[in-house]
Amino acid sequence: MAAPRFGGPRRGGAQHELLEKAARLERGPPPRGDPEAVGRRAVAGDGGSCSGCWCWRRLFRGPRRKKLRQAHARAGKEAPERGLWGPSSLQRLLQRLATWRRRYLRRKERPDRLEEIPLLVLDRAQGGHEAAAGPQSSVPGRPAQAAPARQPRRRSATRSRSPVAPPVHAQDCFFLFGQQKQ
């Protein structure tokens, strides 16, 4: 008689039941009173799947496996795709900032009026938008003193807009960093 299942009987129940019994017999060590146990060495396992089988111990605890684990851990620290900036979250942030800057440049806004983010100088250094970037400043956060690359188009008097905001510098952002002691 088949043992009652938790989820009800399975389709093709007798066949599955036999397969499960066979798998259970092969997987664990034979019971102590079993005549098969006499020929085999009984080893205390850790309770995992196939823990009594020598091949599983060899696969998961052997020196080769240990060496692979160490190499894998080392590769995490020295992963070349991370580049200079460390974790991938920081890379995503930098990418987002670069995209933000490119959008402003695409709108033909004057680059020297754009607030400068020092890490985005990297984008210019790699030659991403040399023509649109304009003159380079020696001090990050400050626009260069040379003439601007393009002048913005003049709007009609009927559609006047507020003047462009001045550049924002890190030392002015008290709400982000808290007041700095001087």
From Swiss-Prot:
Annotated region described as Disordered, given as residue ranges: 1-49, 126-171
Segments of skewed composition (Basic and acidic residues): 17-39
Protein name: Uncharacterized protein C1orf202
Gene source species: Homo sapiens
Gene that this polypeptide is encoded by: C1orf202
